[in-house]
Amino acid sequence: MARDMTPVLKRCRSLDLDPIYLGIDKKSNRNARSGRKLSEYGMQLKEKQKAKFIYGVLEKPFRNYYAKAQKLKYGTTGENLMILLELRLDNVMFRLGYGRTRKEARQIVDHKHVLVNGKPVNIPSYQLKAGDVIEIKEKFKGAQRYKDILEVTGSRMVPAWLEADHENLKGTVTQVPTRAEIDVPVNEVLIVELYSKSLSKPKRRVLECLNLTDRELKLRKFLKIRNMDVL
């Protein structure tokens, strides 16, 4: 899997992002750059990069989240995008205080320390829903690692849409969060504008074709050879 190897604080500076949103309580000693004025596209791109960086999501899965957000029948695309990102298992672990950073929470999930509704889940992007119960496996509950984590995160405020039981290393998604309850400094409207422009009609048609069966693709190729309209 591809990773962004840019130092975290350097990346935060380039995105004008306070590291506290990543769970990092320190700032770079370097002076902030007096950045040049961004174009409309530059601002849109920056917001997308910021959201991807905060949640640790690469371009392809991020685009998939956007496509899923578009298909939801309720809410706006931008708000739905943020809610889908917020309900990732690794993010919820971070919000509950079972990871000092989302990166650490992701590692804990990867290492099969987590149960969701009593069943082991090791997929950081696993999508949670209202009523789901998250718990650290019993055999890991006494580990020094979690004592050290809670020493740092125990004083953090847990979002209203979550219920944390730090004593038993459990947590519950009591409801789906609203956009107002998601404290990330991202302007999702600009992200929607960016994707709306990039997914022009020809590109949308290409994406639709990618979902066709082999038989349909062969038929389209056959018609195209004979200069027939295939769209």
Task: Identify the function of each model-found stretch.
Residues 108-109, 128:
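Short, well-ordered loop/turn sites that connect or cap secondary structure elements
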Residues 99-102:
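Beta-rich strand-turn-strand
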